[in-house]
């Protein structure tokens, strides 16, 4: 039994592939530390074995972030974390990395300008890229130094207009020395709010194969072919 959740609804990024960008403004409150720790106790009592801090918000922004993960560790609950690493500073990394099972970093592109353009305001805001890479590199170094078993990876959410960043992204993953660099398609809603043109994915197949060929013994470049080939075809009849 596992739980997917976030410790806050706040996020400093402005990712073009994120559905939150087309939603109405919402309250961005964060859970209180005491409530977060009590929640862990409840999880342990009912037999929850794992927690994934994903979606909804950037959990690293919550004051409860490190205490929550440390308390999960004391309760023998595995924790994974998806993050942009912007606020994942050295102090937080040192506190939480020994207790995490996996960390998946959202990295929209391999070049600083395109990364900033896709995930923030403009191609000139490359400081967000530089900061994220600094934090990811430190996590990779700390993992090696302490011999941690945590799996570290980067993920690109591929929209057709980002195709120029497929190879730079794969090369970045190899340069960082993370365990994997995964490329997945962008999920749109039935109304096409994000404007994803699924017919364009097939044109990128050769480039995606080239990206996979950059894998080495340290870093596996992975393309989620099933979803990319599936496009916007639904495999279910109803959603509740």
Language-model features, listed with the residues they occupy:
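Conserved SAM/AdoMet-binding glycine-rich loop
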Residues: 13, 23, 36-112
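Short, flexible helix/strand-to-coil boundary loops that buttress conserved ligand/catalytic motifs
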Residues: 19-22, 92, 118-119
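Canonical Radical SAM [4Fe-4S] cluster-binding loop centered on the CxxxCxxC motif
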Residues: 1-35
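Radical SAM enzyme [4Fe-4S]-AdoMet core and its adjacent flexible, acidic
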Residues: 6, 26-27, 31, 45, ...
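Residue-level recognition of beta-strand->loop/alpha-helix junctions
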Residues: 19-22, 55, 83, 156, ...
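Short linear capping/connector segments at secondary-structure termini
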Residues: 21, 53-54, 225-228
């Amino acid at each position: 039994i596992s739980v997917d959740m976030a410790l806050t609804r706040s996020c400093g990024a402005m990712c073009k592939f994120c559905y939150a960008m087309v939603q109405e403004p919402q309250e961005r409150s964060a859970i209180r530390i005491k409530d977060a720790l009590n929640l862990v106790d409840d999880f342990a009592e009912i037999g929850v074995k794992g927690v994934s801090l994903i979606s909804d918000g950037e959990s690293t922004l919550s004051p409860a972030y490190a205490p929550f993960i440390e308390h999960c560790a004391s309760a023998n609950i595995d924790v994974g974390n998806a993050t942009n690493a912007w606020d994942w500073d050295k102090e937080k990394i040192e506190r939480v990395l020994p207790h995490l099972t996996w960390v998946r970093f959202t990295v929209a592109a391999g070049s600083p300008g395109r990364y900033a353009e896709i995930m923030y305001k403009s191609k000139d805001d490359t400081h967000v890229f530089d900061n994220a890479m600094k934090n990811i590199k430190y996590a990779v170094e700390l993992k090696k130094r302490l011999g941690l078993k945590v799996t570290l990876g980067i993920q690109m959410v591929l929209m057709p207009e980002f195709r120029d960043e497929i190879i730079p992204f794969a090369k970045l993953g190899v340069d960082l020395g993370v365990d994997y660099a995964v490329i997945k398609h962008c999920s749109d809603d039935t109304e096409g709010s994000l404007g994803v043109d699924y017919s364009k994915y097939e044109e990128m197949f050769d480039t995606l194969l080239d990206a996979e060929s950059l894998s080495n013994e340290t870093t596996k470049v992975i393309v989620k072919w099933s979803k990319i080939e599936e496009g916007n075809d639904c495999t279910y009849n109803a959603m509740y």
